[in-house]
Amino acid sequence: MNAQAILVLDFGSQYSQLIARRIREIGVYTKVIPYYTPLKEIKNMNISGIILSGSPASVYSKEAPTLDMEIFNLKIPVLGICYGMQIIVKLFGGLVSKDSKQEYGRSEIFLKDEKSLLFSELPNKFQIIMSHGDSIEKIPDNFKQLAFTKNCIASISNETQKIYGLQFHPEVTHSEFGDQILKNFVFKICQAQINWSLEGNLETIVKKIKLKVGSKKVILGLSGGTDSLVCALLIKKAINENLICVFVNTGLLRKNENKKILELKHQYDLNIKYIDASTKFLNRLKNISDPEEKRKIIGKEFVDVFEKITLEDQNIEYLAQGTIYSDVIESKSKDSSSSKIKSHHNVGGLPDKMSLKLLEPLNEFFKDEIIQIGINLGIKKESLYRHPFPGPGLAIRIIGEVTQEKINILQEADNILTEELFINDLYYQIRQAFVVLLPVKSVGVMGDQRTYEYTAVIRCVNTQDFMTAEWTELPYSFLKKVSSRIINEVRGINRVCYDISSKPPSTIEWE
């Protein structure tokens, strides 16, 4: 896309793409590139503003990512967020302290300069999300303080050069007025024009798929989740019958998943090939407890299945995946300055060498954008708003070794949770809900008998984009009913817990 863009220089923050998402939400094209992109390339880009992302690094580290000072001479407005502000301070001769108080989570900010365009139309105090270990000790010459918290300098600016810094994260949904701050930077400071729409970008993606694939065929692993279904219909729109959807029964699926996925064949006129590989997957996972190893094994087994299919049809050249932005972000490795959270099956679980070329048409979109694309493609509510299900399936919701017994137990427990969510009209009010089976047994009493069985954990979260999430405050009466049903109806579980962890610091899935 050649439209003028807001450029996000990524220093390795898990939220870099989220910054881009927030700005795209207000209608402006946004591009994310690595911080080490040569200045010559940046000069050749059509950009109206630059945002410096956060980073897990400290500016004091010898290997800390840095920036070419010449970028500030391009006469383009710059906004540094968290680490981005700290690198500005360091480069301009200020002082960043690594011994000051760390701040993580909610904090109250107070405006010192209410006339700044960055905080235009905002109250003089509000709640924001902090996530930093270092903080500003001394502001550089020609900069001024715009805002503060009880513990640190929260914002600075050099109005003459249009350089701004925020110690907090306006891009996360729990920062009050974060969207307005980004709007102020984009429209009032950068003078950017509205030039982005999901519909227009959708047409571009279809054209790109046609151009890339040509007359070749594409296979796609259909999981029944929103991402893979949207991906399938998008590719079908581009290449029609040259898309072959493959439903691999891994034996790690939700209860009755086979039936639901095969129904998609008739609902959306998809060419679906069914393969039962459950025995093979379970045998390969025997005695494996490490979550990363489980993901890698499952990824390799999927590719093996797909590559065998290509032997039957030499015209198949591409493997399509419903990889989305958050998958890519969480799978970034440390060599790109981002702390790796976990490898996603879609991006980190595939072997380095495979004969198929990878096609990922959704890897620049966030979850809410995927849903909007699905609406545009005519996907029904019950398919579009199904709760996400990971590629490795129940293998990463069974903590520790995967066995057939544990799969059966978890399928039944998870199905009870889903049933009760529908019965109580709660399913569509929650973005993701599932049960985790722990490798922990505890003593219980059922009737007059002593039991020693597994512990199940219910996990329910609400989120807009799956980059941050809050645990869902469900009614006690509902939790009591679900717990009672699981313990009484599922042989093998005698204790049920409820996970009240938010993201961050926890991830949504346990593995």
Swiss-Prot record:
Indicate yes or no for the key word Iron-sulfur.
no
List cellular component terms (GO). cytosol
Q: Which reaction does it catalyse?
A: XMP + L-glutamine + ATP + H2O = GMP + L-glutamate + AMP + diphosphate + 2 H(+)
EC numbers on record: 6.3.5.2
- Asked if the keyword ATP-binding belongs to this entry, the reply reads yes
Under the subunit heading, UniProt states: Homodimer.
Sum up the protein's function in the record's words.
Answer: Catalyzes the synthesis of GMP from XMP.
* Name of the protein in question: GMP synthase [glutamine-hydrolyzing]
What is the primary gene name for this protein? guaA
